[in-house]
Regions:
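Boundary regions of SH3-family modules and the immediately adjacent low-complexity/disordered segments
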Residues: 1-5, 36-38, 50-72
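Extracellular/periplasmic catalytic domains that process cell-envelope and extracellular macromolecules
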Residues: 2, 8-9, 31, 41
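Short, basic/aromatic beta-hairpin or loop at an interaction surface
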Residues: 7-17
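Active-site/binding-pocket entry motifs
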Residues: 14-16, 23, 64
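SH3/SH3-like (including bacterial SH3b) beta-barrel domains
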Residues: 19-42
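Short aromatic-glycine-enriched beta-strand elements
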Residues: 44-48
Length: 72
């Protein structure tokens, strides 16, 4: 599929949010900086991500690779 994460990993890769809490603002409140994220989709440089307690859109540039695995 056309979908790729910031690191060209397959959909469903687990990622870390950037450590800057201001830049992490789209999902601040329920998800701490450094939380493991699941990328649901990507559009125009933004990624729709989900954690255990929150979801939201974050800039692709704010996401750094932590651990990747294929989606189940």
């Amino acid at each position: 599929p056309a979908f790729r994460t910031a690191c060209a990993e397959p959909r469903g890769a687990l990622l870390l949010l950037h450590s800057d809490p201001v830049r992490s603002a789209p999902i601040v409140g329920s998800a701490a900086s450094g939380a493991r994220l699941l990328i649901l989709c990507e559009q125009n440089g933004w990624c729709h991500v989900r954690t255990r307690t929150a979801c939201g859109w974050v800039p692709k540039s704010d996401i750094v690779l932590f651990y990747c695995r294929p989606a189940l």
